[in-house]
């Protein structure tokens, strides 16, 4: 996890503009650098480093002797950089995984570069020889990227929007800042003046298609066919491979553990592989919740079963409520369920940073979207519509769960790794017949659970534990975290304010006091930027006025039984 920032064609003094880059210093607590581009007094790169791979030679922008005209600033991890070196005979100057981007670009251009990378990334690549600037972001947007581009060619790029919103420019004091779309690259011409012109924005691959880099994957070709045993075996092999490749790190590895299926599978496979690879230190797992919350109790069972060094972070309602404003500032969103779920993740990340030496943190994000884990999937009209909904959720991950996971961990200088969003794993899972992927026997993620049923990785009660939203599982069964928040907020927002909410906030108007409260805080820090959230996250096919799983009938009936 690092923070990247760059300006091209600035009309203002760069030494003043660079102050904006310090707003993302939390993403890279180990070192930072600002560097002007040769021959351009109005172009600059900024970089905040979290040293995870090649701690000695990993500063950016990356430049190598072989390609003196290329400048690279990137945030991410390229898991197949060694395989690509062997495949194409690249001669690396450093041990930095991102150096492969320079070699791939020199060999085949930007489209081949983006398509061949197995990993998570957001990058800015400058080619001064051909006067080109390239931006690119990974398939699911696991690594964030924002940009601002004015009509007269001023370009600003940053890992988080907060590093761009206060930039000054002659034609606009507050230029429009937008997220860069996942799975795309952009080509821009660099003029002698330092200004840029956008040439094209291209989607370089789809999450449904098997990635080009699969050809040199260590797993090789999988057995074909959709009989159940073959499918289950392929799921296990690909998921284990997804975890294995993410073990690439020179810093200590830990794992978030809620006691739910997803994080428990990640932790169990992770610890198994660490033993096989003879990694000497114990795996630290981290659970958070209020006293005796379902997540804490379940996580203890998992930790005892797999033998991890387990840490529990217990918080009370006051601590959670006090964190709301910090969380919204970090998130750069006002989405209801995202804010709720982020508070626990933010607090546990804070604990990890202060109390442990784990820096690379594994988590279970992406599984609910991929494997149809949300409660409302039980109400899908058909397997085909459930499959379409799964794809929609994956497409929008960068607005919700992936955003939450990145910002809450990066706020405390941690790097998150999400094996469920491994591109080869997701493309295979999405290629399966729709009827195989739907909930069965009243149980969501049925196929995923089946695939690991005979592995002994987890206790049976954890493998088949019903879905519970993270923001619900961290509180008690009797009173959920969202109810605690709503009770507090009810005293902070009066009825009259809510009645006039649509007048004050015509875009995505708040319809509840809780929503209004979050929106107020968001507008305080990011006034006029409400379009960053195109819509609120809400379940489909059900009559729901709140995104919490505990408001859904299926959930209530399961609890009563």
Curated annotation (Swiss-Prot):
Catalytic residues, chain numbering: 2
Binding site for L-glutamine: 49-53, 75-77, 97
Enzyme class: ligase
MF annotations from Gene Ontology: asparagine synthase (glutamine-hydrolyzing) activity; ATP binding
Keyword Glycosyltransferase appears in the UniProt entry: no
Top-level taxon of origin: Eukaryota
Binding site for ATP: 256, 288, 363-364
UniProt EC number: 6.3.5.4
NCBIfam families named among the record's database cross-references: asn_synth_AEB (TIGR01536)
Reaction catalyzed: L-aspartate + L-glutamine + ATP + H2O = L-asparagine + L-glutamate + AMP + diphosphate + H(+)
Residue intervals of the Asparagine synthetase domain: 213-536
KW Nucleotide-binding (keyword) present: yes
GO-annotated cellular components: cytosol
Every Glutamine amidotransferase type-2 domain range: 2-191
Protein name: Asparagine synthetase [glutamine-hydrolyzing]
Pathway(s) of this molecule: Amino-acid biosynthesis; L-asparagine biosynthesis; L-asparagine from L-aspartate (L-Gln route): step 1/1
PANTHER family reported for this sequence: ASPARAGINE SYNTHETASE (PTHR11772), ASPARAGINE SYNTHETASE [GLUTAMINE-HYDROLYZING] (PTHR11772:SF23)
């Amino acid at each position: 996890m690092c923070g990247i920032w760059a300006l091209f064609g600035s009309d203002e003094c760069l030494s003043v503009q660079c102050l904006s880059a310090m707003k993302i210093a939390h993403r890279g607590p180990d070192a930072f650098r600002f560097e002007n581009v040769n021959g351009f007094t109005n172009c600059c790169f900024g970089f905040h480093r979290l040293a995870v791979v090649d701690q000695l030679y990993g500063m950016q922008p990356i430049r190598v002797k072989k390609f003196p005209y290329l400048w690279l600033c990137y945030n991410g991890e390229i898991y197949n950089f060694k395989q690509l070196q062997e495949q194409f005979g690249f001669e690396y100057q450093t041990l930095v995984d991102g150096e492969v981007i320079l070699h791939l670009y020199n060999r085949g251009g930007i489209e081949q570069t983006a398509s061949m990378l197995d990993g998570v990334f957001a990058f800015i690549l400058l080619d001064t020889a051909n006067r080109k600037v390239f931006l690119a972001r990974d398939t699911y947007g696991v690594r964030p990227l924002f940009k601002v581009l004015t009509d007269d060619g001023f370009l600003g790029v940053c890992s988080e929007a907060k590093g761009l919103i206060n930039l000054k420019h002659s034609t606009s004091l507050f230029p429009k800042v937008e997220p860069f779309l996942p799975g795309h690259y952009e080509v821009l011409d660099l003029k002698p003046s330092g200004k840029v012109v956008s040439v094209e924005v291209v989607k370089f691959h789809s999450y449904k298609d098997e990635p080009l880099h699969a050809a040199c994957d260590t797993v090789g070709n999988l057995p074909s066919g959709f009989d159940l045993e073959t499918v289950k075996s392929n799921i296990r092999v690909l998921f284990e491979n997804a975890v294995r490749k993410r073990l690439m790190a020179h810093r200590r590895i830990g794992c978030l553990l809620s006691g739910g299926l997803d994080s428990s599978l990640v932790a169990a496979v992770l610890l198994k592989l660490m033993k096989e690879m003879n990694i000497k230190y114990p795996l630290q797992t981290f659970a958070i919740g209020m006293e005796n919350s379902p997540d804490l109790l379940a996580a203890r069972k998992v930790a005892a079963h797999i033998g991890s060094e387990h840490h529990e972070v217990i918080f009370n309602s006051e601590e959670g409520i006090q964190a709301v404003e910090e969380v919204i500032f970090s998130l750069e969103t006002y989405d209801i369920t995202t804010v709720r779920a982020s508070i626990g993740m933010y607090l546990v990340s804070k604990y990890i940073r202060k109390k442990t030496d784990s820096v690379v943190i594994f988590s279970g994000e992406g599984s609910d979207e991929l494997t149809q884990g949300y409660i409302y999937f039980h109400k899908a009209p058909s397997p085909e519509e459930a499959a379409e909904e799964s794809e929609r959720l994956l497409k929008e991950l960068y607005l919700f769960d992936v955003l939450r996971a990145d910002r809450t961990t990066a706020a405390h200088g941690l790097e998150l790794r999400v094996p469920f969003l491994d591109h080869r794993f997701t493309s295979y899972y999405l290629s399966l017949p729709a009827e195989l992927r739907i909930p069965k026997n009243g149980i969501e993620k049925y196929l995923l659970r089946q695939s690991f049923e005979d592995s002994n990785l987890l206790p049976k009660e954890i493998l088949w534990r019903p879905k519970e939203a993270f923001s619900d599982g961290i509180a008690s069964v009797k009173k959920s975290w969202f109810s605690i928040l709503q009770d507090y907020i009810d005293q902070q927002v009066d009825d009259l304010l809510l009645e006039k909410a649509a007048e004050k906030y015509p875009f995505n108007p708040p319809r509840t006091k809780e929503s209004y409260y979050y929106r107020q805080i968001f507008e305080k820090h990011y006034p006029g930027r409400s379009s960053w959230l195109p819509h609120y996250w809400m379940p489909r096919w059900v009559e729901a006025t709140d995104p919490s799983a505990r408001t859904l009938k299926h959930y209530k009936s399961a609890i009563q039984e």
